[in-house]
């Protein structure tokens, strides 16, 4: 994607702050991340969104952002079937880590000699590997948790529900469509 750049300036104060985002590729995580991107962009930040191939955002809806695709190893002509959401998130983290490291290094190198400066990575709290990569590369990092209070309560109750045998649900089948 081609970006329009402001005229170069010799002062560090004129450097454009650039925020890097990496949402978990589920709608309940993508939407809040893009809302945050909109707020940051309105306050003068340039925005780069890293995204997986799985459930990739429609880049034409956000022409003001730069998008960097990260191969996830779970999409494509022969996607890996992972029915357990937690297992899928863990698989996604593992599959994206090396490719994200490569792409993040590329973005950082691109901005090292320009008027843009990458100030931080904001990753979904479930994208643990991406946070670790940012840490290893010296990029300040923040995490965004998109769940609400009810979701937090479920997370707290999950171990107890497993201990009592309520989860995972046994003997349940879906009606054929």
Positions of the model-derived regions?
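Nucleotide-sugar-dependent glycosyltransferase catalytic domains
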Residues: 1-177
């Amino acid at each position: 994607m081609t970006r329009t750049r402001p005229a170069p300036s010799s002062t560090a104060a004129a450097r454009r702050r650039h925020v890097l985002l990496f949402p978990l590729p589920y709608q309940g995580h993508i939407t809040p991340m893009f809302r945050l991107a909109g707020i940051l962009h309105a306050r003068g930040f340039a925005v780069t969104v890293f995204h997986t191939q799985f459930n990739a955002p429609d880049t034409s809806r956000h022409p003001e952002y730069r998008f960097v695709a990260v191969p996830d190893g779970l999409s494509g002509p022969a996607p890996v079937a992972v029915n357990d959401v937690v297992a899928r998130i863990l698989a996604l983290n593992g599959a994206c880590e090396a490719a994200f490291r490569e792409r993040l290094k590329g973005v950082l190198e691109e901005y090292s000699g320009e008027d843009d400066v990458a100030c931080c990575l904001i990753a979904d709290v479930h994208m643990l590997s991406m946070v670790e990569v940012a840490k290893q590369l010296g990029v300040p990092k923040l995490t965004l948790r998109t769940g609400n209070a009810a979701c937090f309560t479920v997370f707290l109750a999950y171990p107890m529900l497993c201990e009592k045998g309520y989860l995972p649900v046994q003997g349940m089948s879906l009606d054929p469509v």
